[in-house]
Amino acid sequence: INIGYIASYCKKRFGLKVEITLFKYHEELEEAILESPPDILGLSNYCWCQNLSQEMFKVFSEKNPNGLRIWGGPNFPLDIPSQTKFFKDFRYFDIYVPIDGEVGFSNIVEKSLTVNDTNIRNTVLKDSIDGCVVRNLDGKLLYTFDSTRIKNLDEIPSPYLTGLLDKFFDDKLVPMLQTNRGCPFSCSFCTDGRDAVNQVNRFSKVRVKEEMDYIATHVKKNVHSLFISDLNFGMIPGDIETCNVITDIQKKYGGYPLKILSTTGKNKKEQVIESIKSLHGSLALSMSVQSLDENVLKNIKRDNISADQMLALAPTIKESNLDTTAEIIVGLPSETYDSHLDTIRKLIDAKLDDVIIYTCMLLPGSEMATPEEQSKWKFQTKYRILPMDYAKLHSGKNICETEKVVVGSKDLSFDDYVALRMIAFTLWMTNRGLLYSALLKFLRELQVDVAGLFFQMVERRDDAPEVIKNVYESFKQATIDELYDSPEEILAKIQDDKFYQDIINEKTALNVIRYHHAVVLSKCMDEWTSYALTIARDLIQENGILNKKTEQQFSDIENYCKGRSHNPLGKDRMLTNPEFVFHYDIEKWLSDPTDTLLLENCKMNKPIIEKFVLTDGQFHLIDDNINFFGNSAVGYTKALKLVPSHMFWRKPISKVSGSTQINDHTEWLEYTQLV
């Protein structure tokens, strides 16, 4: 959508004087350059396309030496010395457009239109250009400091409504919507933490409504998701109206979007809750705390964001029937192994549905990536291949993208980093929404430390079933093996066609957590559940509270978790519907809005048999994505990212009632209601 905005703004300013073609797929772009190179080539610079962009610039330079090469995006250093080094390291571009790109890029086009010579470089690169950093013909950098952000975003014509993005409504891409720009926070690890983008500007409600309607009428039937690229969705004035617009679209167009991917606001959580609760669970509430340690928060300039207020709202969130996702980062300044575990424990105690742990990336354009900050905290850094960001060019050259990550510091050893990654994987698998909600609630009811379950699953993994032990060992080794000393080492290694083929064949360069998640779901989900239940039972016993009553209660919890998690991805999954006898009404217990109902008060007069089934809607939603991305672990990795987690798990159906299948009233209800 970013290049769509730039194109629509240029078309508005220059009309028929310019011809603009947009590309998403590198194969099409390279072919177009080779067949008919343009006068100006503009490329985005994000962490997932930096090296590829440079290769495209090289191809372009060979075909049109007189053409202008324009780069733009957030992946650009903040300080002048690092910017100078950036221009030296990346030689195949002429002008950089930082921050918002519409004004800066259109200023380049305006200047280019005054040139009568076929060699536009000689004229355009002589002087500075507002909103740009220019490398002149002598290699000197020319700066301007004028503000180039557009405050009234409706001045930018919609790339959707003008038809510029129609070609991208294929069965591969997920549409993206932007309702506002800017971030009021100053987080040091983020490229949007700089003062230059502190002001939040927004598009009008009418514009957003028209774009949502356009997207819903053009999206392919097998695409069920929507990205909202706002940085604090739900927190900004007007977001409630946006959510109401989306809700109306969902009702009007059979449930689309089923899943919304976005980052919700970091403060004003009451307003965020009010905004997104109308979306029927299609958007989870993000608790992007990153850490709950006061020193860490101060060091990353997040002390103006109240984590305590976030956690205090947990009961309100539950009452609103919202999924919650907490995000934390391993390797932040002054973070220790113990402080990280404390953060995890507090988030688990707050009963958040998901706790997702990321490795700290040093992003060019963020304060934390500056040489001063890296030296201050004595970061130990390595480089990783970005998963699924690789390509083979027409020339036969292999290319991939890399990221710089923190794997240690003066406060965190490398061994600690690996251990925390193991815990991160365990949380990803075992603390995800509905799947083990009964088990976790039961442990809390017995006052057993829930975080201890996840920690002990890692600690006692040598006692796990062989297949689970192998998963853990594979995860640990992959976590170590994915690290390299330099990007040059990676880019040299990928030229080995055997190594490149290993990437294609899913043997390396994977998202380690998501890949192993897909492995477990597709190959050994039953064993994972059994292992988690074994550790939980041991913890209950170690606390001295395993007796005849709790044993029977735990048996029901055990069967419920096994039924829910059974065979989520197998081709025969619609035929393998496990049945269990239950003495307690687990569904009634779980659905108590006050969260005070005890399991012992849900004992039924007589046992019932419940069958655990998947609906046709669940089956087809997952199959739509798997059929597109491929029936492999990596294919599952991609597909599962676009499926709401509750859609994997089976639903219990009481055989006493005579109903052995779910009555699908409407596709909308089936797709959006929590199960």
Segments the model singles out, each with a brief description of its role:
Residues K151-E319, V330:
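Radical SAM [4Fe-4S] cluster-binding motif and immediate context
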Residues V418-M525, Y531:
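C-terminal non-catalytic alpha-helical accessory regions
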Residues E473-T479, L491, Q495-V675:
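C-terminal accessory/interaction regions of large nucleic acid-associated machines
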Residues I1-I3:
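Glycine- and acidic-residue-enriched helix-capping/strand-helix junction motifs
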Residues P38, R202-F203, I249-M457, L575-C602, ...:
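A structural motif corresponding to the C-terminal lobe/cap of the Radical SAM core domain
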Residues Y9, K17-D146, K638:
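Glycine-rich beta-alpha loop elements in corrinoid/cobalamin-binding modules
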Residues I6, L29, L52, M56-F60, ...:
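A general structural detector for well-ordered alpha-helical segments in enzyme core domains, enriched
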